[in-house]
Amino acid sequence: MINLFLFCRAGYEKDCAAEIQVRAAELDIGGFVKTNTNDAYVIFQCFQAGDAEVLAKNISLDSLIFARQMFAAKELLKGLPEQDRISPIVEALAQVHKAGELRVETPDTNEAKELSNFCRKFTVPLRQALKKSGALLEKENPKRPIIHVCFVASGQAYVGFSLSNNSSPYFMGIPRLKIAADAPSRSTLKLDEAFIHFIPKEEQETRLSSGMKAVDLGACPGGWTYQLVRRGMFVAAVDNGPMDQGLMDTGQVKHYQADGFRFEPPRKNITWLVCDMIEKPSRVAELIEAWAINGWFKESIFNLKLPMKARYKEVSTILATMEEILKENGVDDFSIAAKHLYHDRDEVTVHLCLRPSQPW
C-alpha cells in the first residue's frame, strides 16, 4: 500500500501533516502529504509502494500528537457504483488476509458524518463479503489486523488496514465518554479521557487509586478535581475563584484561594498534579518543570494552550525544552507524552511521569 491515512481534528490537518512528514523522514521514507483544511484527515503518500505498511508498523500511534488513528491505505476508490459498492472494496483488499475486525468509518466532520447511517447499514453485507473472500475471519480476533473502510464522500472511500497493537481501540479514534450529571463543567471529560489514554487499563487500579493525594492548579469550578475525587483521591484545589459546592461537600477537597503559579504545597506527598490553566504554554511548562525538579509529585497531566499557527513546532519545542531542563537539573528517570485528545480544543494534553521505571 502506498498511503498512510491519518484521522485528526478538523482544522488541525497542517499540524498532523507536519508531524507525519518529520516522523517519516526519521525512518528515511519519502513521500508527500495531501490534505485540505477542515477535512479532518491527512494522507501521506509514499514514493515507494509498501512503505505505508512500514510507517503503520514502526511509528507508534501513541507517539503522534495530532493523529487520532492511522492505517495503511490503497489509492482512493472513486465512483463506487450504488448498485455494487462491495465488489471494488473486496478487490482492493485482496492482499489482506484473516483480519480480525472491520471498521467502516468517516472523518470527524459534519459533512462526512451524514454518511454514518449508511456506514452502519453497509457494514453488515461488507463484513459477510470480506469473510467469504478470506480477508476477514469468521469471528473477531483482537490480535489480528483491523480492516478500515473510510468514506470521505458518497461513493469515495480509502480502504486498508491497521495493526491491532498499534491502533486506537475506538472507531475514528474517538472515545465516547458521557459527562456525569453532577460534574461542574464539560472540561471534566478532558481529564477523564487523558487518564484513559495515558494510563494502561491494567495499571489504573494502582496508579489512580483511592487515598492518593492530588493537586489541581487552576481548579475552578472543579471539572478536573471532579475526576480525582470520583477516584477517591484527596485534592488540594488551587484557584482564586469559587469551587463547586458539591465537590466541597465530599470532604475530599481543600480549597486554596491562591495563584496557581505561586502556590507551594504544604505537604509534598503528592501523587498527581493536574493543571488546565488558560496561560501561555511555555509558562505552564515552566511551572510543571519547577514542581518536577522539586520532586513534589509522581505524575502530572497538564494542558498546553496552542497558538493559531505552527502548533506542531510550538509543542515539539516546548516538550524538547522540558526534557532538556529536567535532565540538566538531575531529573533523569521520567517519561513524557502528548496528545491532542478528542475533548481538547485548541490545546494538547501532556503526561509527565517521574520515575516510571519503579514498580507501582
Curated annotation (Swiss-Prot):
Cellular compartment(s): Cytoplasm
SUPFAM superfamilies, per the entry: S-adenosyl-L-methionine-dependent methyltransferases
Tagged with keyword Flavoprotein: no
GO terms of molecular function: S-adenosylmethionine-dependent methyltransferase activity
EC nos: 2.1.1.186
Gene Ontology CC: one annotated term: cytoplasm
EC top class, as a word: transferase
Active site: K305
One Pfam family of this chain: RlmM_FDX
Entry keywords, A to Z: Cytoplasm, Methyltransferase, rRNA processing, S-adenosyl-L-methionine, Transferase
Keyword Metal-binding attributed: no
Binding positions (S-adenosyl-L-methionine): S187, C220, P221, G222, G223, D239, D259, D276
InterPro entries named among the record's database cross-references: RlmM_FDX, RlmM_THUMP-like, RNA_MeTrfase_FtsJ_dom, rRNA_MeTrfase_M, SAM-dependent_MTases_sf
Principal location class: cytoplasm
Gene Ontology biological process: methylation; rRNA processing
Catalytic activity, reaction form: cytidine(2498) in 23S rRNA + S-adenosyl-L-methionine = 2'-O-methylcytidine(2498) in 23S rRNA + S-adenosyl-L-homocysteine + H(+)
Disulfide cross-links: none
General function of this protein: Catalyzes the 2'-O-methylation at nucleotide C2498 in 23S rRNA.
Family of this protein: Belongs to the class I-like SAM-binding methyltransferase superfamily. RNA methyltransferase RlmE family. RlmM subfamily.
Assembly and interaction partners: Monomer.
The protein's name in its UniProt record: Ribosomal RNA large subunit methyltransferase M
Species annotation: Shewanella halifaxensis (strain HAW-EB4)
Gene label: rlmM
